[in-house]
Regions:
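An amphipathic, aromatic/His-enriched active-site/gating alpha helix that lines ligand/cofactor pockets
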Residues: 24, 28-36, 55-89
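Glycine-rich beta-strand-turn "strand-cap" elements at beta-sheet edges
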Residues: 41-48, 75-108
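Short, surface-exposed ligand-recognition loops at beta-strand->loop->(often short) alpha-helix junctions
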Residues: 10-15
Length: 108
């Protein structure tokens, strides 16, 4: 699995509508072969910060960055942002899904 976390600092005028602004990109990415998850989260400490958590099968990330919707997002997103996003990109060989946390269990 390729696990990617991207931190976006959003312009004040787009803070409340950011998810709608990126909805088409999000939907198109989630429909890609090899996309395991593509989930947005808003910081509870910084109102203008959104985190994108992405997971792709090992061979799917290249197709993602070469897709038309990714190329369009690279044109559209900068106008929504205060600064260039920061990213953590990690290859986890053999991984395809989330694991249960080992440190404790929730009994149902």
């Amino acid at each position: 699995m390729i696990l990617i976390n991207v931190k976006y600092k959003v312009r004040p005028e787009f803070v409340d509508t950011f998810r709608q602004e990126v909805a088409a990109f999000t939907d198109a990415t989630r429909a890609e072969d090899g996309c395991l998850f593509f989930d947005w989260y808003r910081s509870t400490e910084e109102d203008d910060v959104y985190i994108l958590v992405e997971g792709f099968k090992d061979d799917a990330a290249e197709a993602h960055v070469n897709s038309e919707h990714f190329k369009q997002a690279c044109v559209d997103m900068p106008k929504l942002l205060v600064e260039t996003p920061t990213i953590i990109n990690t290859l986890i060989p053999g991984k395809t899904e989330w694991d249960e946390m080992a440190e404790f269990k929730v009994e149902n």
